[in-house]
Protein backbone atom coordinates (compact mmCIF):
# COMPACT_ATOMS: atom_id res chain seq x y z
CA UNK A 1 0.00 0.00 0.00
CA UNK A 2 1.48 3.36 -1.06
CA UNK A 3 1.34 6.45 1.14
CA UNK A 4 -1.84 8.46 0.56
CA UNK A 5 -1.17 11.72 -1.30
CA UNK A 6 -4.72 12.78 -2.14
CA UNK A 7 -6.88 15.53 -0.62
CA UNK A 8 -6.29 15.62 3.15
CA UNK A 9 -9.67 17.17 3.90
CA UNK A 10 -11.37 14.13 2.39
CA UNK A 11 -9.53 11.84 4.81
CA UNK A 12 -10.17 14.17 7.75
CA UNK A 13 -13.90 14.16 6.90
CA UNK A 14 -13.82 10.37 6.85
CA UNK A 15 -12.79 10.39 10.51
CA UNK A 16 -14.79 13.47 11.45
CA UNK A 17 -11.83 15.32 12.92
CA UNK A 18 -8.86 17.43 11.84
CA UNK A 19 -6.20 14.72 12.03
CA UNK A 20 -3.83 16.76 9.83
CA UNK A 21 -4.29 20.06 11.70
CA UNK A 22 -6.67 23.00 11.38
CA UNK A 23 -9.02 22.59 8.42
CA UNK A 24 -11.51 25.28 7.37
CA UNK A 25 -13.41 22.98 5.01
CA UNK A 26 -13.80 20.32 7.68
CA UNK A 27 -15.41 22.81 10.04
CA UNK A 28 -18.13 23.35 7.42
CA UNK A 29 -18.47 19.76 6.20
CA UNK A 30 -17.86 17.58 9.24
CA UNK A 31 -19.39 14.43 7.75
CA UNK A 32 -18.07 11.63 5.49
CA UNK A 33 -17.27 12.53 1.87
CA UNK A 34 -19.42 11.33 -1.00
CA UNK A 35 -22.85 12.03 -2.43
CA UNK A 36 -24.70 10.71 0.62
CA UNK A 37 -22.07 11.54 3.21
CA UNK A 38 -24.34 13.73 5.30
CA UNK A 39 -27.15 11.18 5.51
CA UNK A 40 -25.43 7.79 5.73
CA UNK A 41 -25.90 6.17 9.12
CA UNK A 42 -24.78 2.59 9.31
CA UNK A 43 -23.97 0.66 12.44
CA UNK A 44 -20.27 -0.15 12.42
CA UNK A 45 -19.08 -3.55 13.62
CA UNK A 46 -16.57 -3.92 16.45
CA UNK A 47 -13.93 -4.90 13.90
CA UNK A 48 -14.84 -1.88 11.78
CA UNK A 49 -14.40 0.46 14.75
CA UNK A 50 -11.01 -1.04 15.57
CA UNK A 51 -9.86 -0.92 11.94
CA UNK A 52 -10.98 2.70 11.66
CA UNK A 53 -8.89 3.64 14.70
CA UNK A 54 -5.81 1.97 13.22
CA UNK A 55 -6.36 3.78 9.92
CA UNK A 56 -6.72 7.08 11.76
CA UNK A 57 -3.41 6.53 13.57
CA UNK A 58 -1.66 5.59 10.31
CA UNK A 59 -2.95 8.67 8.49
CA UNK A 60 -2.20 10.95 11.45
CA UNK A 61 1.46 9.92 11.63
CA UNK A 62 1.89 9.20 7.91
CA UNK A 63 2.97 5.60 8.45
CA UNK A 64 2.50 2.72 6.00
CA UNK A 65 0.91 -0.59 7.01
CA UNK A 66 4.16 -2.58 7.21
CA UNK A 67 5.85 0.14 9.26
CA UNK A 68 2.85 0.36 11.56
CA UNK A 69 2.75 -3.41 12.06
CA UNK A 70 6.48 -3.46 12.87
CA UNK A 71 6.04 -0.68 15.42
CA UNK A 72 3.15 -2.53 17.02
CA UNK A 73 5.18 -5.74 17.29
CA UNK A 74 8.04 -3.78 18.84
CA UNK A 75 5.62 -2.18 21.30
CA UNK A 76 4.12 -5.55 22.21
CA UNK A 77 7.59 -6.87 23.10
CA UNK A 78 8.42 -3.85 25.25
CA UNK A 79 7.74 -3.28 28.91
CA UNK A 80 4.75 -1.09 29.60
CA UNK A 81 1.25 -0.79 28.18
CA UNK A 82 1.38 -1.84 24.53
CA UNK A 83 -0.92 0.88 23.19
CA UNK A 84 0.90 3.66 25.00
CA UNK A 85 4.30 2.34 23.93
CA UNK A 86 3.03 2.26 20.32
CA UNK A 87 2.15 5.95 20.49
CA UNK A 88 5.53 6.73 22.06
CA UNK A 89 7.27 4.94 19.18
CA UNK A 90 5.23 6.96 16.68
CA UNK A 91 6.06 10.17 18.55
CA UNK A 92 9.75 9.26 18.50
CA UNK A 93 9.96 9.08 14.70
CA UNK A 94 12.27 11.78 13.33
CA UNK A 95 9.61 13.30 11.06
CA UNK A 96 7.23 13.61 14.01
CA UNK A 97 9.88 15.16 16.28
CA UNK A 98 10.69 17.71 13.56
CA UNK A 99 6.96 18.53 13.42
CA UNK A 100 6.65 18.78 17.21
CA UNK A 101 9.65 21.14 17.31
CA UNK A 102 7.79 23.49 14.98
CA UNK A 103 10.37 23.21 12.20
CA UNK A 104 7.62 22.14 9.78
CA UNK A 105 3.90 23.05 9.68
CA UNK A 106 2.73 19.46 9.11
CA UNK A 107 4.13 15.95 9.47
CA UNK A 108 4.10 15.61 5.68
CA UNK A 109 6.23 18.75 5.38
CA UNK A 110 8.52 17.44 8.12
CA UNK A 111 8.92 14.16 6.25
CA UNK A 112 9.92 16.09 3.13
CA UNK A 113 12.48 18.20 5.01
CA UNK A 114 14.06 15.05 6.41
CA UNK A 115 14.07 13.25 3.05
CA UNK A 116 15.65 16.26 1.33
CA UNK A 117 18.52 16.33 3.85
CA UNK A 118 17.66 19.55 5.66
CA UNK A 119 17.65 17.97 9.14
CA UNK A 120 20.50 16.80 11.39
CA UNK A 121 20.65 14.49 14.39
CA UNK A 122 23.54 15.20 16.76
CA UNK A 123 25.17 17.24 14.00
CA UNK A 124 24.95 14.64 11.23
CA UNK A 125 22.44 14.73 8.37
CA UNK A 126 19.78 12.02 8.64
CA UNK A 127 17.38 11.60 5.71
CA UNK A 128 15.27 8.73 7.05
CA UNK A 129 11.86 9.97 8.30
CA UNK A 130 11.28 6.79 10.31
CA UNK A 131 14.58 7.17 12.19
CA UNK A 132 13.92 6.56 15.89
CA UNK A 133 15.07 9.54 17.96
CA UNK A 134 16.45 8.65 21.38
CA UNK A 135 16.11 10.83 24.49
CA UNK A 136 19.02 13.25 24.69
CA UNK A 137 19.58 13.48 20.94
CA UNK A 138 19.66 16.94 19.37
CA UNK A 139 17.62 17.61 16.24
CA UNK A 140 18.75 20.60 14.20
CA UNK A 141 18.32 22.40 10.91
CA UNK A 142 21.22 22.09 8.51
CA UNK A 143 23.18 25.35 8.34
CA UNK A 144 22.44 26.04 4.68
CA UNK A 145 18.75 25.31 5.24
CA UNK A 146 18.13 27.73 8.12
CA UNK A 147 16.98 30.52 5.82
CA UNK A 148 14.29 28.41 4.12
CA UNK A 149 10.95 30.21 4.10
CA UNK A 150 8.93 27.12 5.01
CA UNK A 151 11.00 26.64 8.17
CA UNK A 152 10.96 30.32 9.16
CA UNK A 153 7.19 30.51 8.66
CA UNK A 154 6.60 27.35 10.68
CA UNK A 155 8.73 28.55 13.60
CA UNK A 156 7.20 32.03 13.65
CA UNK A 157 5.12 32.28 16.80
CA UNK A 158 5.28 28.53 17.48
CA UNK A 159 4.64 27.66 21.13
CA UNK A 160 7.29 25.13 22.10
CA UNK A 161 6.15 24.96 25.72
CA UNK A 162 3.07 22.95 24.68
CA UNK A 163 5.21 19.83 24.44
CA UNK A 164 7.04 19.27 27.76
CA UNK A 165 9.13 16.37 26.43
CA UNK A 166 11.15 18.55 24.05
CA UNK A 167 13.16 21.75 24.36
CA UNK A 168 14.07 24.28 21.66
CA UNK A 169 16.99 26.68 21.27
CA UNK A 170 16.12 29.37 18.74
CA UNK A 171 19.67 30.73 18.48
CA UNK A 172 21.01 27.42 17.15
CA UNK A 173 17.70 26.35 15.58
CA UNK A 174 17.93 23.00 17.29
CA UNK A 175 15.90 21.05 19.79
CA UNK A 176 16.35 18.10 22.10
CA UNK A 177 14.12 15.15 22.87
CA UNK A 178 14.22 15.18 26.67
CA UNK A 179 12.21 11.99 27.08
CA UNK A 180 9.42 10.10 25.36
CA UNK A 181 6.04 11.67 26.12
CA UNK A 182 3.56 10.30 28.62
CA UNK A 183 0.19 9.32 27.14
CA UNK A 184 -1.54 12.26 28.83
CA UNK A 185 0.82 14.67 27.03
CA UNK A 186 0.10 13.36 23.52
CA UNK A 187 -2.74 15.51 22.10
CA UNK A 188 -3.84 13.15 19.31
CA UNK A 189 -7.34 11.74 19.73
CA UNK A 190 -6.41 8.10 19.18
CA UNK A 191 -7.96 5.23 21.15
CA UNK A 192 -4.88 3.04 21.12
CA UNK A 193 -6.55 0.19 23.02
CA UNK A 194 -8.78 -0.44 20.00
CA UNK A 195 -5.66 -0.93 17.89
CA UNK A 196 -4.27 -3.39 20.41
CA UNK A 197 -7.55 -5.32 20.31
CA UNK A 198 -7.47 -5.37 16.49
CA UNK A 199 -3.98 -6.87 16.31
CA UNK A 200 -4.78 -9.32 19.11
CA UNK A 201 -7.48 -11.07 17.07
Curated annotation (Swiss-Prot):
Residues 92-152 form the S4 RNA-binding domain. The keyword Ribonucleoprotein applies. The keyword rRNA-binding applies. Belongs to the universal ribosomal protein uS4 family. One of the primary rRNA binding proteins, it binds directly to 16S rRNA where it nucleates assembly of the body of the 30S subunit. With S5 and S12 plays an important role in translational accuracy. Part of the 30S ribosomal subunit. Contacts protein S5. The interaction surface between S4 and S5 is involved in control of translational fidelity. This is Small ribosomal subunit protein uS4. It comes from Parabacteroides distasonis (strain ATCC 8503 / DSM 20701 / CIP 104284 / JCM 5825 / NCTC 11152). The gene is rpsD.
Amino acid sequence: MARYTGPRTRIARKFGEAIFGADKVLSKKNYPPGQHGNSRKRKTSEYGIQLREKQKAKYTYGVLEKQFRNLFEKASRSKGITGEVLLQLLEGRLDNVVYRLGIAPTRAAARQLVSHRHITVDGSVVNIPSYSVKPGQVIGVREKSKSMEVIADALSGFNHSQYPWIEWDQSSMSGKLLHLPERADIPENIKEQLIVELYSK
